[in-house]
Regions:
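Amphipathic, Lys/Arg-enriched alpha-helical "gate/interface" segment within cytosolic domains
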Residues: 1-141
């Protein structure tokens, strides 16, 4: 599965990363794994990095599923980074499903803008201790 996440408890931040071909099933599995992690707190901010996804094979109905929509609290600030048009459009649709009065989900084309919006310092692409939901640890590029 081409997904990984890191939960940075001191910064109250979840960094998610997807790459390669991303399917609906993989996206749902990713969110389930995140929710089941004991370090996860739904009020944490999220930085989702979709820059390395080459194909989005995601059904828009899945974007509105309870598994995805109810994972984070409505007050959690969430930044999705999707530079290509398909990823940006799907992220926008997902944002519409998770609508909150606070407008706490934003879609960006550049990582720097997303980090600034979340109030983070610039960081590299390495997730460090990311939890890889792939079948083998060697599948993470």
């Amino acid at each position: 599965m081409p997904t990984a996440f890191e939960i940075d408890v001191p910064r109250r931040l979840v960094v998610c990363r997807c790459w390669g071909v991303l399917t609906s099933d993989e996206l749902v599995s990713h969110y389930r794994a995140l929710r089941s992690d004991p370090a996860f707190d739904p009020s944490f901010s999220q930085l989702a990095d979709l820059r390395e996804v080459t194909v989005f094979d995601v059904d828009t109905r899945v974007l509105g599923s309870r598994t995805l929509v109810a994972t984070f609290a409505p007050t959690a600030r969430r930044a999705l980074v999707a530079p290509n048009d398909v990823g940006y459009a799907l992220s926008y649709v997902y944002g519409r499903y998770t609508q909150s009065a606070e407008k706490n989900l934003q879609v960006f084309r550049a990582m720097r803008e997303a980090e600034q919006w979340l109030g983070l310092r610039a960081r590299g692409n390495d997730l460090g201790r990311a939890k890889d939901s792939a079948a083998s640890p060697d599948s993470n590029p």
